[in-house]
Regions:
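Membrane-embedded helical hairpins/re-entrant loop segments and their flanking transmembrane helices
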Residues: 54-81, 250-264
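Alpha-helical transmembrane segments and their immediate interhelical loop/hinge regions
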Residues: 203-253, 259
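Helix-boundary and loop/linker segments of multi-pass membrane transporters
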Residues: 29-37, 68-71, 108, 217-224, ...
Length: 344
C-alpha cells in the first residue's frame, strides 16, 4: 500500500509539473530543453551528484559520536534507501526523516533514537546552510552585480525570516530544555495510560528512555565544536553544489545569469517544497521560474526550461539513483557482500 501511495504521489507530481509547463507553453519549453548543450548539462548533473554525496557526508559526520553507527557500504545503502523515501514521500523532509533513521539503525548496532537525532540535526544544518548561501549570494550581487534586487530581497526576507525564526525557536527550546521537558511529560503520561490498560505489558521507561537517547545525542553533537564546524561547512558546500546545476542548466540554454543570483534563487526555490507532493514537485519549479523571471529578466519559457533541467539534474537524478539502491536492497538484502566493508 505504501508503494502504491508513493507511485500515486509521483504520478500527481509529474502531472502538476506538466500542467505548469503547459500553462507557460509546452512546445516552447520542450524546444528549449531539447536544444540544451549536452556537455554543459553533464556538468550540471555532476554537480548535482556531488551535492548528494555531500548530503550523505553530512549525516556520516554527525554519526561520529554514535557507538555502533552504520559505516562503509552499510551506511551508503541505508542512507540512499532512506533518501529514496525522502524523495518519494510528500513533505519528504519530515516524513522521510524517521524512515532514514530506521534504516540506519536497522543496518547497524545503534539505536533508532540516536539516528533520528542525527538525521533531524542534518536537516537543520541544511536549512541553515541554504539561508547562509542565499545571504552570501545577495551580498555579492548587491556589491558587484549592479542590478535591481528588490524582488530577491523581498523573497529572502520572507523565506529567510521564517526559516531563521524556526531555527532560532528550536535552538532556544533545546538549550533551555523546553522540548525535552514537554516530550518527557507527554511520554510519561502515555506510559501511564498504556500501563493502566488490562492485558497489555508494561511499557514503563520505554518511551522516556528513547527520548532521553534522542536528546542525549543532540547534546553530544552540540558539545563537539569540531563536529559543528565540519557539519556547517559541509552543509554550505552541499548547497553550493545544489546551486551549480541551475547555473550550468541556464548556460546550457544559452542564458548567462550571474552566479551570485543563482546562489540566491536555488535556496529560495526550495521553500516551494511546502506543497504536499514528492520532492515539492510543482511548487519548486513554479517558485524557481518566477524568481528567474522577476530577478534576471529571463523569458518565462526559458526560465521554465531552466527549472525543469535543474530538477532533472538534482531531484530526479537523486530519485533514480537512490531508488535503484532501494530496489537492490529489497531484492538482495542489506548485508554487505564483502568482509572488508565492515572495516570501513
Amino acid at each position: 500500500m505504501q508503494w502504491r501511495r508513493a507511485v500515486a504521489g509521483l504520478v500527481v507530481a509529474v502531472g502538476v509539473v506538466g500542467l505548469f509547463v503547459t500553462g507557460v507553453g509546452w512546445n516552447e519549453v520542450l524546444e528549449h530543453v531539447r536544444a540544451a548543450h549536452p556537455v554543459t548539462l553533464a556538468g550540471a548533473l555532476v554537480a548535482g551528484l556531488g551535492m548528494l554525496a555531500l548530503r550523505g557526508a553530512l549525516v556520516k559526520r554527525l554519526l561520529a559520536p554514535i557507538d555502533g553507527a552504520a559505516s562503509g557500504t552499510t551506511f551508503a545503502t541505508a542512507y540512499l534507501s532512506g533518501y529514496f523515501a525522502r524523495s518519494a514521500l510528500p513533505w519528504g523532509r519530515s516524513t522521510g526523516t524517521p524512515v532514514m533513521a530506521f534504516l540506519l539503525a536497522r543496518d547497524s548496532d545503534s539505536e533508532f533514537e540516536d539516528n533520528l537525532a542525527v538525521v533531524a540535526a542534518a536537516e537543520g544544518f541544511n536549512l541553515v546552510g541554504s539561508l547562509v548561501l542565499a545571504g552570501i549570494g545577495i551580498a555579492i550581487f548587491a556589491t558587484v552585480g549592479g542590478g535591481s534586487i528588490d524582488t530577491v530581497i523581498g523573497s529572502l526576507a520572507v523565506a529567510g525570516g521564517g526559516g531563521l525564526l524556526t531555527a532560532g525557536a528550536l535552538v532556544v527550546m533545546f538549550n533551555r530544555g523546553v522540548a525535552r521537558r514537554v516530550s518527557f511529560g507527554f511520554a510519561a503520561r502515555c506510559e501511564t495510560a498504556i500501563g493502566s490498560l488490562p492485558r497489555l505489558p508494561s511499557v514503563e521507561g520505554h518511551l522516556t528512555n528513547r527520548i532521553d537517547g534522542f536528546f542525549g545525542t543532540l547534546e553530544a553533537i552540540q558539545a563537539s565544536r569540531r563536529t559543528l564546524v565540519a557539519a556547517f561547512g559541509i552543509a554550505v558546500a552541499s548547497w553550493l553544489l545544489n546551486a551549480l546545476p541551475l547555473y550550468f542548466g541556464l548556460l546550457a540554454l544559452g542564458v548567462d545569469v550571474p552566479l551570485a543570483l543563482v546562489l540566491v534563487c536555488a535556496p529560495l526555490a526550495s521553500f516551494g517544497g511546502i506543497v504536499p507532493l514528492p520532492g515539492g514537485s510543482g511548487g519548486i519549479e513554479v517558485v524557481l521560474a518566477s524568481l528567474l523571471v522577476a530577478t534576471a529578466g529571463v523569458p518565462a519559457d526559458v526560465a521554465t526550461a531552466g527549472a525543469i533541467l535543474y530538477r532533472l539534474t538534482t531531484y530526479w537524478a537523486h530519485f533514480a539513483i537512490s531508488g535503484a539502491v532501494a530496489v537492490l536492497v529489497s531484492v538482495f538484502g542489506t548485508k554487505p557482500a564483502l568482509p572488508i566493508d565492515r572495516g570501513l
